[in-house]
Amino acid sequence: MRDYDEAIAFLGEWGPFQRLIFFLLSASIIPNGFNGMSVVFLAGTPEHRCRVPDAANLSSAWRNNSVPLRLRDGREVLHSCRRYRLATIANFSALGLEPGRDVDLGQLEQESCLDGWEFSQDVYWSTVVTEWNLVCEDNWKVPLTTSLFFVGVLLGSFVSGQLSDRFGRKNVLFATMAVQTGFSFLQIFSISWEMFTVLFLIVGMGQISNYVVAFILGTEILGKSVRIIFSTLGVCTFFAVGYMLLPLFAYFIRDWRMLLLALTVPGVLCVPLWWFIPESPRWLISQRRFREAEDIIQKAAKMNNIAVPAVIFDSVEELNPLKQQKAFILDLFRTWNIAIMTIMSLLLWMLTSVGYFALSLDTPNLHGDAYLNCFLSALIEIPAYITAWLLLRTLPRRYIIAAVLFWGGGVLLFIQLVPVDYYFLSIGLVMLGKFGITSAFSMLYVFTAELYPTMVRNMAVGVTSMASRVGSIIAPYFVYLGAYNRMLPYIVMGSLTVLIGILTLFFPESLGMTLPETLEQMQKVKWFRSGKKTRDSMETEENPKVLITAF
């Protein structure tokens, strides 16, 4: 009896066909990188102050002193949300009184920005914040906008796998590309914050669905040796490339509507990929469409300049997927040991996700150039992914994950010790923290898959990755803490990251251990460990079914 991989082994692992699929599917991830982080510039909040109408009868001295000062980071700046009561200072101006000399400004009555705001255009010309005045009493709408995008990501995670199982990988891949690109384009015509946010939620659904289906399609078409590299370096690195393109677009296009228009262009350029990316032969076989699957394999063999056997699938009945025991979510809590491990995994995924997305979204709040900071935040991800891949090949999982979490959280805690004038050092520490947390995040898929038995492995990875979506939903509010104290987000994120690093040490080690098949074969969390564990040689290849559901 031959399985699918044996039936197509004659194709080889890394011919022209595999290289083309690797590159095209990875390239299809690029729009996900800038769409996923576009809110950084679409909803950027520029410096602002209360507007004083030109019609107000004020002397130049009173006009220049119409907005009170407040302390921010140890220095006095103009208040963003208050002004002196206009009727009062207009009366003083008419009487010829001078501010500060004849009138004590500290005793004057203040009022809110009844005539709107004046926004600085030094960094942004136009954002959704300036469009709909999402500041002061309405500043809560900015993190909510981002959170609702990630709610869409959560919803898309639920449906993307089911849709691709029902309608095919290729069809759903391009349909979700169209959703992501099309609804991003529709956002340009938003007439209200509510309309923009609802459309943004739908963009989030398309964004993650495209990512997941491209991942599934690649892991099903590519061979075992290439599959692992594709699932770690391929999709992650190209996501980071898209992320790096975002600040480049935003630097030259500082109007939010024009920026959105520019960001839809790469999605349109993906349309020709339809004629180069095939359907998954594995999926076609599962649908008993054997002739179509053979046609794809024959074309691949021709591209690789390899002779095709007379019969590729000699016993189609034997190639049907093996039936697996049905699992339920409650199986992840069936015993005390697996329940503790599941709860620990949920916390690890959620809080690592909070750190990753909060640091990514916080780049405009760093000192210096917002566009350069965003680019550096994206650039640091590439060495982080490469480092994670290299570490996973030889070193114990729980120790390396804990180490990079300690690194990431520790440097974030050091930021509060840096003098305000040394902002370049603060930025460097933030990037080092992002490096550590990104490395840890990319390792969690493999680690979780190795801990759980076959019967619940896919479900475990799926449920824990859902926890990471919850983390991304609450991450914008960690950034929002900076409105109260500039250091507060780093103190909270750093502390939580160090704590989950400690938590990671209580997981069992999975390197060198045979993948468990049943709940009884699962290793115990550290405080339940007793007796001597048997160490078996680990299979050199990952379980394909694990990799398919990893992201």
Curated annotation (Swiss-Prot):
Cellular compartments annotated = Apical cell membrane; Basal cell membrane; Mitochondrion membrane
InterPro entries documented for this protein:
MFS_dom, MFS_sugar_transport-like, MFS_trans_sf, Orgcat_transp/SVOP, S22A4/5, Sugar_transporter_CS
User: Which reaction does this chain catalyze?
Assistant: ergothioneine(out) + Na(+)(out) = ergothioneine(in) + Na(+)(in); acetylcholine(in) = acetylcholine(out); (R)-carnitine(out) + Na(+)(out) = (R)-carnitine(in) + Na(+)(in); glycine betaine(out) + Na(+)(out) = glycine betaine(in) + Na(+)(in)
> Extracellular side of the membrane: what ranges?
42-141, 193-197, 254-257, 359-371, 421-426, 482-486
Residue ranges in the Cytoplasmic topological domain are: 1-20, 163-171, 219-232, 279-337, 393-399, 448-460, 508-551
Q: Which UniProt keywords apply?
A: ATP-binding, Cell membrane, Glycoprotein, Ion transport, Membrane, Mitochondrion, Nucleotide-binding, Sodium, Sodium transport, Symport, Transmembrane, Transmembrane helix, Transport
| Topology within the bilayer | Multi-pass membrane protein
Residues with glycosylation annotation = 57, 64, 91
- List the Gene Ontology MF annotations in alphabetical order: acetylcholine transmembrane transporter activity; amino acid transmembrane transporter activity; amino-acid betaine transmembrane transporter activity; ATP binding; carnitine transmembrane transporter activity; PDZ domain binding; symporter activity
Q: Which family does it belong to?
A: Belongs to the major facilitator (TC 2.A.1) superfamily. Organic cation transporter (TC 2.A.1.19) family.
State the name under which the record lists this protein: Solute carrier family 22 member 4
What's the source species for this entry?
Answer: Papio anubis
Q: Which gene encodes it?
A: SLC22A4
